[in-house]
Amino acid sequence: MGVFQILMKNKELIPLAFFISVAATGATSFALYALKKTDVVIDRKRNPEPWEMVDPTQPQKLITINQQWKPVEELQKVRRATR
């Protein structure tokens, strides 16, 4: 028996199957969305400090309102001193 035959035989399972498929699709799409973000580290051996490569001018949040980035001179001095 196929899945559709079971659903047609037991019509009370149709909403359950619908919500399970919507939840699975949402979970999969969120996982793919999260893996595309720059703060996710999959391979730590080739890139041990990925936060150094983040472009500060590119917004990392879903929505940014009036975000203006300016480098902090003290932090730049510390970064240069630790290299």
Curated annotation (Swiss-Prot):
Encoding gene, per UniProt annotation: Nmes1
BP GO terms, sorted: response to bacterium
Family to which the UniProt record says this protein belongs: Belongs to the complex I NDUFA4 subunit family.
Tissues expressing the protein: Strongly expressed in vertebrae, brain, intestine and stomach.
Alphabetical list of Pfam families matching this protein: B12D
Cell location: Nucleus
Organism for this UniProt entry: Mus musculus (Mouse)
Protein name per Swiss-Prot or TrEMBL: Normal mucosa of esophagus-specific gene 1 protein
Main location: nucleus
One Gene Ontology cellular component annotation held by this UniProt entry: nucleus
InterPro entries in the record: B12D (IPR010530)
Alphabetic keyword roster: Nucleus
